[in-house]
């Protein structure tokens, strides 16, 4: 009997034989018998272990190990191997030992492997090559001798390769139909054969009661359509039936009017323009086009043909009375509209008129295409940006317009158009009528444009404009005009998610009840106007609706050779979105390279995510990342890539995950490196002014740039401008830096407390939001559990107050304090921490607590301790050593409050993360909690990636580990600690986004419990940090939310401890307020809800 085959003949052999196959990689032959079991027993146990089964030899069954590669990956490898030279075959076999096998690791999770998966893959490659080479007359004889020809996907791959190489479709079984062009990798024929034998066995032993059908014997067994997407990711109602659509006619908001009284313009004071012209907002550098006038731009017959249809949309049921002297005018909306503020289920859709009259709309097509052509010729930059931004689903007749406003006999008062795409222009044309006057006047230009039937005006609709008087209105004047534009709301995350759910429903309708056998699925296939978006079939159900929407947004932009910014709240899964995007691009362009830039601490997070989702089919043959753990492997991968670049090896696409500090060296090494796609994680770094990183990336000449950031705006609005300008260079041409800064200044002025700047701030806010909408996918909301965010103002002990006076920490002095001055922070932690810091004798907890008293008594300003200070420091050390912990803790308000929070969390058997900026504070917190016998683990910036991973694992798995102490500025990135549902920010940084990142370590996807955040501030240093934070938060909300916000005044903050709705928390606040420090000051002075530190203006 050949080596590796054995005959089962003992009563306990099935389990032991399968154990041997699984652990040794050898194959085994079994026969049905009372001692082994029937066919159902053999197949079900084999499937449970994910092993393979072949129906040979006659009367028996061959059990094979699980194939450690995905089906399509094995196909690609076999294709390469079959076409390779002998030397290249050796290299391919050697490379098998250098790669990862996540499927193998998963299948062996309960077994110890005695073989390398590369050995098994090598055998399959060699067999496929041999099968391709044998003469036609010998092919069928292999069927009885090779179990590989009875398992999928090896069987299909062999037939496929032979068809390509030899042109003969000789299949293992002549009765089988030819292999389809698109391979379906499953063991259907084997399963049918086995099922038939099993059915015969069951018919003989019918008294056994029957059994369920056998699943297809393949690692990828297919996915039912109902399981393709997760719950909530598929549209629930049929939009094609009129009964399901609410009639919202007239509820569209297209104007922004900022006055209680209608203001009408007259021709006096305006220059009348009658000749073709282009107008700019100012002369000189940085000017932008604001109006293009084209008299006779469209043939009159084309206009009147369109008017016959469009005039039917006009109605007096509308919200535009403010621009018509208080009475509703004759106006209507055609095309698509975003009803984001309406209480309706479907927000983004056709207007009622459009839905009922699409059949007539073809009469307007010629007019729209005429206007679109004029637009592209006379304002090409605006037109291109609008072409990039508009979702294909909302294009009217293939143009860059999504929406048309139709006005009849409507002399508009002064207004601006609300919700138009600000990187584009509105296109105005008169299409019917007999009248005189009623010119369109733009106030800032002091120009009025004569518009007769066929005349066209492209203009910036954010500028205040209105119609001049009608001449001889008593002559029954008639005038029909249209404005064509792109509604920015249609590009919102709400609309993107609605689109995605609709597409998912169409996909499921196409599939009907057919099981999905492909390992990948094009989730955009239902709409031919969309670019393909390939996702691993098993992964599709793991992607949340917001992730699917983000992917759709990105691929539409990259398909139009533009980049974009993905601004999603931390924890919503941006990394998975980016990896899926890489997968789709490599599926379409297998030889393309992708560059991912990420901060060094997050590289390991990318590797972990890649490994985690690999079990769902998200795998990459060449994923090169340096996380500091496998530097040798990283260098070997670079050498392999170098050989490809030198044409020594076949080209294969690589995904490089590197940090920005290494980028320069990488580009020096690979001078011809031309990535197809660049992804920048924590991409707000490319927004820094004069950034060398952007200079390096610009030299790569890659237009497909995707920025990932939960915090795209860190300090001021100019960062956002540089960020959007980096992903699409054309944006700065339509909104020069000077103009953007004027808008940002208007917002800043209001945010910082100037209520008189409210009107200008609103205008600027709306403009910036509409300008960036086409290039920024923003989703700041989430469906996570509740977040309770509190600001706890802690008291100071008499010792702390004494040192505050010594340092001159008055309010006046503190306003001038440099951000780099750490003394107040250490003092608010504990006087011991402060004294140790200024004496320069602090050692970490690894070395223990030591005090080196100075021999001389110098002044405090010399950073040496006075005698009394040295005695105090020694006294504090003794308190810790003698476990006089309450006495030690009560010298600091922050420490007292922190310890009580920790003990409360411990009593509830929950977990807590403590973030601090300073090593001294981290060490003191760790030492104090350890002395209290609270199991605590600390992760700091200098710690290795291995220690961080160990911390994540321990914190998740060890029930006794209650507290993690983390460095805010380092450990706040790339780590997930959803085991914790309490977060303490022991001190805060000037940038609120650093704190937001820290909170997101616990408050993120996969968090199942409500999360409570405690921000501890002292009465000294932290309130100035808080003022800086609230200003920036107000700015962020102004720009990324439709909220005009400002800093709350101190008098507006209300202590919420007494009206706390949670009884247990209310009692806890009362207990803290009743606790006194040394010197009889309360440990807790006030409790505020953090969100109330920023106020919305109504």
Swiss-Prot record:
GO annotation (BP), single: reciprocal meiotic recombination
Region (DNA Helicase): 541-1098
Region annotation (Thymine dioxygenase) ranges: 1-540
Binding site residues for Fe cation: 415, 417, 465
GO CC annotation: nucleus
Domain Helicase ATP-binding: 555-730
EC numbers on record: 3.6.4.12, 1.14.11.6
Taxonomy, superkingdom: Eukaryota
Localization in the cell: Nucleus
Protein's UniProt name: Bifunctional helicase and thymine dioxygenase JBP2
Gene expressing this chain: JBP2
């Amino acid at each position: 009997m050949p080596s590796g085959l054995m005959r089962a003949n003992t009563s306990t052999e099935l389990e032991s034989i399968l154990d041997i196959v699984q652990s040794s990689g050898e194959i085994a032959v079994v026969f049905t018998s009372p001692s082994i079991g029937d066919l159902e027993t053999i197949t079900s146990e084999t499937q449970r272990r994910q092993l393979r089964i072949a129906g040979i030899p006659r009367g028996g069954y061959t059990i094979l190990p699980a194939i450690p590669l995905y089906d399509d990956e094995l196909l690609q490898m076999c294709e390469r191997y079959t076409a390779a030279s002998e030397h290249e075959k050796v290299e391919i076999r050697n490379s098998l030992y250098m790669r990862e096998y996540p499927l193998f690791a998963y299948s062996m999770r309960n077994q110890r492997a005695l073989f390398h998966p590369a050995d098994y893959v090598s055998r399959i490659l060699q067999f496929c090559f041999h099968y391709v080479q044998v003469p036609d007359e010998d092919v069928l004889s292999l069927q009885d001798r090779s179990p590989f020809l009875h398992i999928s996907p090896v069987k299909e791959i062999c037939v496929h390769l032979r068809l390509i190489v030899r042109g003969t479709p000789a299949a293992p079984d002549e009765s089988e139909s030819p292999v389809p062009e698109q391979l379906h990798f499953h063991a259907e024929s084997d399963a049918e054969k086995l099922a038939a034998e099993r059915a015969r066995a069951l018919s003989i032993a019918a008294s056994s009661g029957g059994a369920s059908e056998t699943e297809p014997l393949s690692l990828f067994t297919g996915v039912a359509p109902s399981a393709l997407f997760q719950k909530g990711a598929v549209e629930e109602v049929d939009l094609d039936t009129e009964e399901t659509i609410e009639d919202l006619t007239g509820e569209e908001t297209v104007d922004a009017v900022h006055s209680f009284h209608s203001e009408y313009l007259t021709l006096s004071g305006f220059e009348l323009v009658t000749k073709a012209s282009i107008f700019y907002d100012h002369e000189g550098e940085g000017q932008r086009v604001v109006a293009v006038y084209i008299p006779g731009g469209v043939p009159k017959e084309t206009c009147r043909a369109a008017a016959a249809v469009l005039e039917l949309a006009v109605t007096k049921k509308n919200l535009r009375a403010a621009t018509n002297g208080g009475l509703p005018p004759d106006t209507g909306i055609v095309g698509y509209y975003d009803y984001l503020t309406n209480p309706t289920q479907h927000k983004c859709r056709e207007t009622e008129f459009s839905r009922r009259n699409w059949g007539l709309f073809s009469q307007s097509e010629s007019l729209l295409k005429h206007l679109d052509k004029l637009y592209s010729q006379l304002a090409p930059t605006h037109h291109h940006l609008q072409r990039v931004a508009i979702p294909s689903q909302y294009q009217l007749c293939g143009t860059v317009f999504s929406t048309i406003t139709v006005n009849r006999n409507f002399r508009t008062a002064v207004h601006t158009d609300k919700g138009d795409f600000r990187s584009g222009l509105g296109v105005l044309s008169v299409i019917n009528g007999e009248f005189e006057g009623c010119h369109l006047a733009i106030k800032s230009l002091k120009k009025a444009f004569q518009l007769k039937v066929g005349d066209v005006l492209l203009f910036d609709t954010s500028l205040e404009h209105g119609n001049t008087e009608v001449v001889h209105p008593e002559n029954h004047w008639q005038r029909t005009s249209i404005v064509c534009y792109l509604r920015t709301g249609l590009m919102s995350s709400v609309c993107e998610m609605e689109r995605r759910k609709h597409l998912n429903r169409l996909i499921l309708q196409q599939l009907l009840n057919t099981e999905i056998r492909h390992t990948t699925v094009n989730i955009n296939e239902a709409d031919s106007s969309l670019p393909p978006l390939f996702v691993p079939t098993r992964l599709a159900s793991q992607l949340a609706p917001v992730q699917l929407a983000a992917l759709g947004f990105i691929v539409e932009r990259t398909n139009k050779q533009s980049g974009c910014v993905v601004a999603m709240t931390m924890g919503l899964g941006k990394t998975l979105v980016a990896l899926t995007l890489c997968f789709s691009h490599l599926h379409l362009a297998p030889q393309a390279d992708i560059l991912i830039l990420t901060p060094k601490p997050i590289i390991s997070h990318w590797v972990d995510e890649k490994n985690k989702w690999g079990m769902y089919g998200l795998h990459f043959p060449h994923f090169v990342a340096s996380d500091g753990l496998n530097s040798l492997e990283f260098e070997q991968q670079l050498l392999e890539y170098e050989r490809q670049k030198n044409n020594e090896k076949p080209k294969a696409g690589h995904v490089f995950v590197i940090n920005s500090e290494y980028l320069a060296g990488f580009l020096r090494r690979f001078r011809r490196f031309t990535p197809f796609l660049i992804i920048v994680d924590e991409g707000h770094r490319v927004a820094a002014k004069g950034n060398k990183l952007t200079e390096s990336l610009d030299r790569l000449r890659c237009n497909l740039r995707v920025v990932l950031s939960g915090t795209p705006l860190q300090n001021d609005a100019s960062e956002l401008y540089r960020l959007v300008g980096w992903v699409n260079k054309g944006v700065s041409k339509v909104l020069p830096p000077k103009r953007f800064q004027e808008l940002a200044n208007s917002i800043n002025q209001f945010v910082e407390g100037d209520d008189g700047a409210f009107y200008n701030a609103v205008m600027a806010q709306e403009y910036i939001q509409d300008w960036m909408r086409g290039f920024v996918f923003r989703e700041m909301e989430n469906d996570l559990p509740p977040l309770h965010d509190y600001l706890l103002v802690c008291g100071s002990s008499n010792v702390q107050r004494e040192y505050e006076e010594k340092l001159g920490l008055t309010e006046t002095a503190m306003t001038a304090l440099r951000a780099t001055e750490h003394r107040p922070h250490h003092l608010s932690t504990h006087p011991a921490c402060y004294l140790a810091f200024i004496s320069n004798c602090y050692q970490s907890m690894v070395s223990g607590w030591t005090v080196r008293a100075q021999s001389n008594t110098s002044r405090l300003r010399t950073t040496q301790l006075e005698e009394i200070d040295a005695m105090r420091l020694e006294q504090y050390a003794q308190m810790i050593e003698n476990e006089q912990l309450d006495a030690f803790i009560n010298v600091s308000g922050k420490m007292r409050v922190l310890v009580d929070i920790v003990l409360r969390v411990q009593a509830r058997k929950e977990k807590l993360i403590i973030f601090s900026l300073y090593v001294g504070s981290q060490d003191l917190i760790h030492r104090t909690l350890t002395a209290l016998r609270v199991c605590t683990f600390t992760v700091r910036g200098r710690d290795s990636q291995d220690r961080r991973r160990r911390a994540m694992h321990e914190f998740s798995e060890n029930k006794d580990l209650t507290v993690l102490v983390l460095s805010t500025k380092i450990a706040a990135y790339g780590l997930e600690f959803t085991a914790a549902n309490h977060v303490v920010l022991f001190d805060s940084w000037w940038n609120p986004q650093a704190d937001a990142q820290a909170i997101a370590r616990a408050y993120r996807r996969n968090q199942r419990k409500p999360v409570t955040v405690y921000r501890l501030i002292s009465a000294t240093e932290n309130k100035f940090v808080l003022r800086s934070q609230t200003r920036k938060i107000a700015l962020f909300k102004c720009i990324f939310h439709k909220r005009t916000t400002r800093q709350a005044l101190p008098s507006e903050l209300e202590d919420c401890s007494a009206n706390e709705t949670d009884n247990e928390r209310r009692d806890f606040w009362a207990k803290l307020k009743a606790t006194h420090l040394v010197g009889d000051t309360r440990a807790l002075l006030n409790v505020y809800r953090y969100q109330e530190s920023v106020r919305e203006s109504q």
